[in-house]
Amino acid sequence: MGALASRQHAGVEEMDMPCNSLYRYPPKSGSYFGSHFIMGGEKFESSHPEGYLFGENSDLNFLGSRPVTFPYTAPSPQEPVKTLRSLINIRKDTLRLVRCTEELKTTGVEGSRPKVHYNVEFTFDTDARVAITMYYQATEEFQGGIPSYLPKSSNLQSDTVHFKRGVSQQFCFPSHTVDPSEWREEELTFDLDREVYPMVVHAVVEEGEEHLGHSHVLMATFEKHADGSFCVKPLKQKQVVDGVSYLLQEIYGIENKYNSQDSKVAEDELSDNSAECVVCLSDVRDTLILPCRHLCLCNACADTLRYQASNCPICRLPFRALLQIRAMRKVPGPHSPGGFSPIIAAPTSDSEEHTSEHVPPGYEVVSLLEALNGPLTPSPSAPPLRALGEARRPGGLPSYGSDIHLRMHSPLQHLCGGQALKLKKSISRSISQNSSVLQEDEMEKSFSEAEIQTPRKKTSQLAEENGVTPESENLTLSSSGAIDQSSCTGTPLSPTISSPEDPLSSSLAQSIMSMASSHSQQSQLSTDTVSSMSGSYTAGGMEEEEGGITPSPPAAASGSPSIEGELSPAESPEPHFVTVSAEEMDAEGNVTEEEFASPEEDDGQMTGRECDNNNAAGVTLRDVLDNVRGSEGCLADVCYSSIPGQQRSNPYHGSDNCISLQDDTQSHLSTKLV
């Protein structure tokens, strides 16, 4: 995307052109964009010439003025590809100037004002050893795809500080100070004509040949207050991977404020940042509006909005495209290894019936916000239930809360009059695109197991009449998600930080859905969150079937037709047991229907269980994908490449967009132009 003549017969490195001519916006001549663009493996015609889909056109000038060779070959539509790894992320909202405690007075002048110096502090995450250097009044140069920054003078840069891998690391260099008052007023801000950045934080990966040149760049400006003090303002962030520079853009509405440490967050602010679509207030939001980048719609409402309106419901600005982002998680088999390679799915169709056909084998669709932030609205009232079983996975198992796409109807209900917890005869089944669905053969096997257990129930009834409560009658059912300790890499989605070997690294939330049968069987599906990209818009929805019976999972591989879990009182509290007295059973040992309310009599939504998610409750917000325990909420970013698509049959220069996600994350992107 650029001048056609400059790309036909000349190599990228041999082009003779001014440094600030063709690849600046607006260009001095010709067009910056071509007539089409490629997203998610599908070609789209540009409906708005010279229109940047992901932000302001002026943002393109941060990508650099010279092209480089794009290092990736264009994959076939059916060929899986790896997502980009984002090993470093600087949380730009944490960047600040801290006034030094010791102020230097000007020598020889009495009564002069003390000279104020500042330290620079910020928080960052890294999945590898990293070297961080700060530059002031610096220009940017690319040599072999690796950026370098040259300050105006040698004293306008800090010493290089080395850090090991880790999450939520604090950069604080007391011996390095900066005094913005020494600079002219025009040097405090960024001027495109001068191409001088007031402040640059350059973090470079120092390990692994495969990560050579991998770096993260934070550019910032200074602002002077009325009292003479200064503050620093983040300008832009870039990620350099394999010699390609990607511009990071925020996605608004993807952060999780329920895990915020700030107790002063207003309730209405929390409600504004809930997971529900702002139009229907029921389905989970998964569609991004471009170019304003508000993630506020579900795919069904977005499909309707295309034909009824042309303005964003949040900012009321006209939009030109809708981008659906579907997160998927991998459901490994019983003998599958812990690590895996993420893939990007092929383009999907517009029909929801065909949505499941484009889900890669072994993956299932989950809520994007749940995948990034963990459970959004855990209920504080219901204690977590533990299922009976022989094997237990280490670590906590947070539930998905009461989200409409992810909730599982609880079969337990408290009854008045001092009666114990009783088991319902009819259990409603909720089927959605984010819930685990049992196959028909599993249903038949579960029903056959229930028939086998009928003589056992009669025996238990006789034993209960004699004052003995059989252990097999102590039943618990639970629906929970778990966070896998393994972590991987890559915003979009965003600049995310994680590592398959480091349990402390941040990653997209990896979850487990488990259901315990009425015979105390625990079936857990360990899953890893992945993400895929696809180039067509996919309308999604949710179907619910009330009054159905949720079958129990098939018996474990031990070979016994039923597993009778046994828990000691110290291991499981009494509220987790369900006792059915003999008087409440009929002659065949079944629970009588009069004692229990039908699903149609339930008013309101079932309350989700309280659980700990992978984000520590009580942490400040930040704008990265950090979902390791003890980490904070996150804000995903979208990456855009500065490299023209030479191998995409497009002769013009522009930014190749890319989604920077974790290695175990697949984000399904569907785009539909308006």
Curated annotation (Swiss-Prot):
Keywords: Cytoplasm, Metal-binding, Transferase, Ubl conjugation pathway, Zinc, Zinc-finger. The keyword Zinc-finger applies. Residues 583-604 have a biased composition (Acidic residues). It is found in: Cytoplasm. InterPro entries: MGRN1/RNF157-like, Znf_RING, Znf_RING/FYVE/PHD. GO terms for molecular function: ubiquitin protein ligase activity; zinc ion binding. GO terms for biological process: protein ubiquitination. Its EC number is 2.3.2.27. Residues 509-526 have a biased composition (Low complexity). Residues 376-404, 433-610 are annotated as: Disordered. A zinc finger (RING-type) spans 277-316. PROSITE patterns: ZF_RING_2. Its main location: cytoplasm. This is E3 ubiquitin ligase Rnf157. It comes from Xenopus laevis.
